[in-house]
């Protein structure tokens, strides 16, 4: 009976270990979460964005012309909602890659944002952390990719 109890404890601990290793920071979840971030910006989903952003969030925009914290991002979304600003027609990500190290992950790729008259392509690099089993976006860096010169 004692051996059976020991086996149960060992199996239980092993399952907890596997479960902890398969937290929110995995390739599939992070790609889906990042796609949800893009969708939330397009749809001005204030609640989702507020819950996703870490308290220490920072967003460095193109050429560091603007650097936002969580409060600034949320205030901008509120302004867009209040003014019914729906100028962004689409946000499409491509070539998304994920790197995971411990409780930190980098998601990078390109987002094509169409606000008219022509879409603009941005390279992005976002840093996600796992905090008490929840994935949070703690940093975002975006840079416009210049259009190729026409021959």
Residue ranges of model-derived segments:
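A beta-strand edge to alpha-helix "cap/lid" segment located at domain peripheries
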Residues: 21-51, 58-151
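Bacterial Sec-dependent N-terminal signal peptides
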Residues: 1-25
């Amino acid at each position: 009976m004692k051996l059976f109890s020991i086996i149960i404890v060992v199996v239980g601990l092993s399952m907890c270990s596997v479960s902890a290793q398969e937290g929110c920071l995995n390739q599939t979840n992070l790609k889906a979460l990042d796609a949800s971030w893009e969708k939330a910006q397009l749809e001005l989903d204030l609640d989702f964005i507020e819950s996703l952003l870490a308290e220490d969030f920072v967003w460095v925009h193109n050429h560091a012309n603007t650097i936002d914290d969580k409060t600034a991002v949320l205030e901008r979304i509120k302004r867009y909602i209040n003014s019914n600003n729906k100028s962004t027609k689409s946000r499409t990500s491509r070539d998304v890659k994920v790197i995971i190290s411990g409780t930190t992950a980098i998601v990078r790729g390109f987002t094509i944002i169409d606000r008219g008259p022509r879409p603009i392509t941005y390279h992005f690099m976002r840093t996600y952390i796992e905090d008490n089993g929840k994935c949070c976006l703690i940093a975002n860096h975006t840079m416009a990719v210049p259009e190729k010169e026409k021959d």
